[in-house]
Amino acid sequence: MQPLQNRPDLGEEILSQLYRPLEACYNTCYCKKCCYHCQFCFLKKGLGICYEQSRKRRRTPKKAKANTSSASNNRLIPNRTRHCQPEKAKKETVEKAVATAPGLGR
């Protein structure tokens, strides 16, 4: 066997290994030996880095979304108008009560 320094294709071999895509490894063990046995396992298990696309939440269908929004709008509008007017009346009655109530004398 030739020494590593005298091999002419050593640099090319190292570069080809460096830029080679990582192969999938289906070993689910997290022991030290399994975490360090390949670059993929080291990144995924050892460092906890995973470049896979994360699963996104399922969205509700547009039909269901449209029905709920229209129903919520119908419910909210009457509540707003119903609560706005009595608040003004309450404030007026409180102001009148404070103005007419005799204060505590000294």
Curated annotation (Swiss-Prot):
It holds the Pfam family Tat. Keywords: Activator, Host nucleus, Host-virus interaction, RNA-binding, Transcription, Transcription regulation. Residues 42-52 are annotated as: Core. Residues 96-106 have a biased composition (Low complexity). Residues 55-65 have a biased composition (Basic residues). Residues 67-76 have a biased composition (Polar residues). Residues 55-106 are annotated as: Disordered. It is found in: Host nucleus, Host nucleolus. GO terms for molecular function: RNA binding; RNA-binding transcription regulator activity. Residues 25-41 are annotated as: Cysteine-rich. One of its GO terms (biological process) is positive regulation of viral transcription. GO terms for cellular component: host cell nucleolus. InterPro entries: IV_Tat, Tat_dom_sf. Residues 84-95 have a biased composition (Basic and acidic residues). Its main location: host cell. A motif (Nuclear localization signal, and RNA-binding (TAR)) lies at residues 53-59. Belongs to the lentiviruses Tat family. Interacts with host CCNT1. Associates with the P-TEFb complex composed at least of Tat, P-TEFb (CDK9 and CCNT1), TAR RNA, RNA Pol II. Interacts with CCNT2; the resulting complex is unable to bind to TAR RNA. Transcriptional activator that increases RNA Pol II processivity, thereby increasing the level of full-length viral transcripts. Recognizes a hairpin structure at the 5'-LTR of the nascent viral mRNAs referred to as the transactivation responsive RNA element (TAR) and recruits the cyclin T1-CDK9 complex (P-TEFb complex) that will in turn hyperphosphorylate the RNA polymerase II to allow efficient elongation. The CDK9 component of P-TEFb and other Tat-activated kinases hyperphosphorylate the C-terminus of RNA Pol II that becomes stabilized and much more processive. This is Protein Tat. It comes from Simian immunodeficiency virus (isolate K78) (SIV-mac).
